[in-house]
Protein backbone atom coordinates (compact mmCIF):
# COMPACT_ATOMS: atom_id res chain seq x y z
CA UNK A 1 0.00 0.00 0.00
CA UNK A 2 1.40 3.42 -0.99
CA UNK A 3 1.78 6.30 1.45
CA UNK A 4 -1.08 8.08 -0.28
CA UNK A 5 -3.40 5.10 0.12
CA UNK A 6 -2.34 4.70 3.74
CA UNK A 7 -3.18 8.35 4.35
CA UNK A 8 -6.62 7.91 2.81
CA UNK A 9 -7.32 4.86 4.97
CA UNK A 10 -6.15 6.66 8.09
CA UNK A 11 -8.37 9.62 7.28
CA UNK A 12 -11.46 7.47 6.82
CA UNK A 13 -10.97 4.94 9.60
CA UNK A 14 -9.05 6.69 12.36
CA UNK A 15 -9.60 10.45 12.38
CA UNK A 16 -13.23 10.79 11.38
CA UNK A 17 -14.63 7.52 12.70
CA UNK A 18 -15.63 9.07 16.03
CA UNK A 19 -16.90 12.31 14.49
CA UNK A 20 -18.84 11.42 11.35
CA UNK A 21 -21.63 8.88 10.95
CA UNK A 22 -19.95 5.54 10.00
CA UNK A 23 -22.60 5.07 7.32
CA UNK A 24 -21.39 8.21 5.61
CA UNK A 25 -17.82 6.93 5.66
CA UNK A 26 -18.83 3.61 4.13
CA UNK A 27 -20.76 5.36 1.36
CA UNK A 28 -17.68 7.29 0.19
CA UNK A 29 -15.10 5.69 -2.09
CA UNK A 30 -12.22 6.65 0.18
CA UNK A 31 -10.95 9.24 2.59
CA UNK A 32 -10.09 11.58 -0.26
CA UNK A 33 -13.76 11.89 -1.23
CA UNK A 34 -14.65 12.64 2.37
CA UNK A 35 -11.90 15.25 2.60
CA UNK A 36 -13.28 16.86 -0.55
CA UNK A 37 -16.74 16.98 1.02
CA UNK A 38 -15.36 18.67 4.12
CA UNK A 39 -13.44 21.21 2.04
CA UNK A 40 -16.55 22.00 -0.01
CA UNK A 41 -18.61 22.38 3.15
CA UNK A 42 -16.12 24.83 4.67
CA UNK A 43 -16.14 26.85 1.43
CA UNK A 44 -19.83 27.57 2.06
CA UNK A 45 -18.68 29.82 4.89
CA UNK A 46 -15.24 31.00 3.76
CA UNK A 47 -14.34 32.50 0.40
CA UNK A 48 -10.94 31.96 -1.19
CA UNK A 49 -9.39 29.88 1.61
CA UNK A 50 -9.21 26.55 -0.23
CA UNK A 51 -5.45 26.05 0.17
CA UNK A 52 -5.52 26.84 3.90
CA UNK A 53 -8.46 24.46 4.36
CA UNK A 54 -6.57 21.62 2.65
CA UNK A 55 -3.47 22.25 4.78
CA UNK A 56 -5.63 22.34 7.91
CA UNK A 57 -7.08 18.93 7.05
CA UNK A 58 -3.56 17.65 6.37
CA UNK A 59 -2.46 18.72 9.85
CA UNK A 60 -5.50 16.98 11.34
CA UNK A 61 -4.57 13.84 9.43
CA UNK A 62 -1.00 13.98 10.70
CA UNK A 63 -2.17 14.36 14.31
CA UNK A 64 -0.59 17.81 14.47
CA UNK A 65 -1.66 21.34 15.39
CA UNK A 66 -1.80 24.58 13.40
CA UNK A 67 -0.80 28.18 14.15
CA UNK A 68 -2.71 30.73 12.06
CA UNK A 69 -0.83 34.02 11.92
CA UNK A 70 -2.49 37.00 10.30
CA UNK A 71 -4.19 40.32 10.92
CA UNK A 72 -7.76 40.49 12.29
CA UNK A 73 -10.65 39.96 9.90
CA UNK A 74 -9.13 37.29 7.68
CA UNK A 75 -11.42 34.46 8.81
CA UNK A 76 -9.23 32.57 11.29
CA UNK A 77 -11.97 32.04 13.86
CA UNK A 78 -14.59 31.37 11.20
CA UNK A 79 -12.39 28.66 9.65
CA UNK A 80 -12.01 26.83 12.97
CA UNK A 81 -15.75 26.93 13.66
CA UNK A 82 -16.63 25.79 10.13
CA UNK A 83 -14.23 22.85 10.37
CA UNK A 84 -15.69 21.76 13.71
CA UNK A 85 -19.24 21.95 12.36
CA UNK A 86 -18.30 20.07 9.20
CA UNK A 87 -16.85 17.24 11.30
CA UNK A 88 -19.66 17.36 13.86
CA UNK A 89 -16.88 17.64 16.43
CA UNK A 90 -16.70 19.13 19.88
CA UNK A 91 -15.52 22.74 19.78
CA UNK A 92 -14.17 25.11 22.42
CA UNK A 93 -12.65 28.56 22.23
CA UNK A 94 -10.23 30.24 24.61
CA UNK A 95 -9.75 34.00 24.32
CA UNK A 96 -6.22 34.44 25.64
CA UNK A 97 -5.55 37.50 27.79
CA UNK A 98 -2.66 38.54 30.09
CA UNK A 99 -4.66 37.67 33.22
CA UNK A 100 -5.63 34.16 32.06
CA UNK A 101 -4.36 31.34 34.31
CA UNK A 102 -3.30 27.78 33.38
CA UNK A 103 -6.25 26.44 35.38
CA UNK A 104 -8.61 28.43 33.16
CA UNK A 105 -7.37 26.28 30.28
CA UNK A 106 -7.06 22.82 31.78
CA UNK A 107 -9.65 22.98 34.53
CA UNK A 108 -9.45 22.72 38.31
CA UNK A 109 -10.71 20.60 41.19
CA UNK A 110 -13.46 22.41 43.07
CA UNK A 111 -14.63 21.47 46.57
CA UNK A 112 -18.25 20.30 46.67
CA UNK A 113 -19.66 20.96 50.14
CA UNK A 114 -22.70 18.76 49.63
CA UNK A 115 -20.64 15.73 48.61
CA UNK A 116 -17.75 16.67 50.90
CA UNK A 117 -15.25 16.01 48.12
CA UNK A 118 -13.37 17.66 45.29
CA UNK A 119 -14.89 17.40 41.81
CA UNK A 120 -13.24 18.19 38.51
CA UNK A 121 -14.45 21.26 36.69
CA UNK A 122 -13.18 20.58 33.18
CA UNK A 123 -11.57 23.37 31.19
CA UNK A 124 -11.97 24.18 27.49
CA UNK A 125 -9.25 21.67 26.50
CA UNK A 126 -11.71 18.82 27.01
CA UNK A 127 -12.94 18.92 23.43
CA UNK A 128 -12.02 17.80 19.90
CA UNK A 129 -11.15 21.08 18.20
CA UNK A 130 -9.75 23.85 20.40
CA UNK A 131 -9.42 27.40 19.13
CA UNK A 132 -6.67 29.20 21.07
CA UNK A 133 -7.52 32.74 19.99
CA UNK A 134 -4.68 35.29 20.16
CA UNK A 135 -2.41 32.85 21.96
CA UNK A 136 0.44 35.36 22.22
CA UNK A 137 -1.59 37.67 24.46
CA UNK A 138 -1.16 35.27 27.38
CA UNK A 139 1.97 35.01 29.50
CA UNK A 140 4.41 32.14 28.84
CA UNK A 141 3.27 30.59 32.14
CA UNK A 142 -0.30 30.44 30.89
CA UNK A 143 0.74 29.28 27.43
CA UNK A 144 2.49 26.35 29.08
CA UNK A 145 -0.93 25.05 30.10
CA UNK A 146 -1.29 23.77 26.54
CA UNK A 147 2.08 22.04 26.27
CA UNK A 148 1.15 18.68 27.79
CA UNK A 149 -2.20 18.25 26.06
CA UNK A 150 -0.80 19.26 22.66
CA UNK A 151 2.15 16.86 22.84
CA UNK A 152 0.88 13.94 24.93
CA UNK A 153 -2.89 14.23 24.43
CA UNK A 154 -3.46 14.26 28.17
CA UNK A 155 -4.15 16.80 30.90
CA UNK A 156 -2.73 16.38 34.40
CA UNK A 157 -4.65 18.10 37.19
CA UNK A 158 -3.50 17.61 40.78
CA UNK A 159 -1.53 14.52 39.83
CA UNK A 160 -4.35 12.81 37.92
CA UNK A 161 -4.18 12.50 34.12
CA UNK A 162 -7.22 12.87 31.87
CA UNK A 163 -7.78 12.55 28.12
CA UNK A 164 -8.91 15.87 26.59
CA UNK A 165 -10.65 14.44 23.51
CA UNK A 166 -10.11 12.02 20.65
CA UNK A 167 -9.03 13.37 18.27
CA UNK A 168 -7.60 16.54 19.82
CA UNK A 169 -6.71 19.34 17.41
CA UNK A 170 -5.50 22.82 18.39
CA UNK A 171 -5.91 25.77 16.05
CA UNK A 172 -4.09 28.76 17.54
CA UNK A 173 -4.18 32.30 16.18
CA UNK A 174 -1.93 35.31 16.65
CA UNK A 175 -1.70 38.82 15.24
CA UNK A 176 1.82 39.39 13.86
CA UNK A 177 1.64 43.19 13.80
CA UNK A 178 0.78 43.70 17.48
CA UNK A 179 3.64 44.69 19.78
CA UNK A 180 1.93 45.98 22.92
CA UNK A 181 0.47 43.51 25.40
CA UNK A 182 1.76 40.43 23.61
CA UNK A 183 4.35 37.82 24.54
CA UNK A 184 6.56 35.84 22.15
CA UNK A 185 5.68 32.16 21.94
CA UNK A 186 8.31 29.99 23.69
CA UNK A 187 10.30 27.55 21.59
CA UNK A 188 8.63 24.63 23.37
CA UNK A 189 5.24 26.02 22.37
CA UNK A 190 6.22 26.61 18.74
CA UNK A 191 7.55 23.05 18.56
CA UNK A 192 4.03 21.73 19.21
CA UNK A 193 2.73 23.16 15.94
CA UNK A 194 3.04 21.16 12.75
CA UNK A 195 2.24 24.14 10.52
CA UNK A 196 2.24 27.93 10.61
CA UNK A 197 -0.21 29.31 8.06
CA UNK A 198 -1.27 32.74 6.83
CA UNK A 199 -4.87 33.42 5.83
CA UNK A 200 -4.05 36.49 3.69
CA UNK A 201 -6.43 39.34 2.94
CA UNK A 202 -9.18 38.70 0.39
CA UNK A 203 -8.99 40.11 -3.12
CA UNK A 204 -11.54 42.62 -4.41
CA UNK A 205 -13.46 39.84 -6.18
CA UNK A 206 -13.48 37.74 -3.01
CA UNK A 207 -14.73 40.71 -0.97
CA UNK A 208 -17.70 41.05 -3.33
CA UNK A 209 -18.46 37.34 -2.98
CA UNK A 210 -18.25 37.64 0.82
CA UNK A 211 -20.68 40.56 0.71
CA UNK A 212 -23.15 38.51 -1.31
CA UNK A 213 -22.70 35.46 0.91
CA UNK A 214 -23.33 37.33 4.16
CA UNK A 215 -26.00 39.71 2.85
CA UNK A 216 -28.90 38.00 4.64
CA UNK A 217 -27.37 35.86 7.42
CA UNK A 218 -24.19 34.19 8.58
CA UNK A 219 -23.97 30.88 6.64
CA UNK A 220 -22.17 29.35 9.61
CA UNK A 221 -25.49 29.24 11.46
CA UNK A 222 -27.01 26.90 8.88
CA UNK A 223 -23.90 24.85 8.13
CA UNK A 224 -24.46 21.11 8.60
CA UNK A 225 -21.98 18.23 9.08
CA UNK A 226 -20.87 16.27 6.02
Where are these regions (language model features)?
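Conserved ASCE P-loop NTPase core motifs with emphasis on AAA+ ATPases
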Residues: 3-42
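Pre-Walker A (pre-P-loop) alpha-helix and adjacent loop at the N terminus of AAA/AAA+ ATPase modules
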Residues: 30-74
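Conserved alpha-helical scaffold flanking the Walker A/P-loop in AAA+ ATPase domains
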Residues: 55-58, 111-131
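Walker A/P-loop
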Residues: 60-97
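Conserved beta-strand position immediately N-terminal to the Walker
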Residues: 66, 130, 168
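Walker B catalytic acidic pair
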Residues: 70, 133-134, 145
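AAA+/P-loop NTPase substrate/partner-engagement loops
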Residues: 86-114
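Canonical AAA+ ATPase core
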Residues: 112-117, 138, 142, 150-226
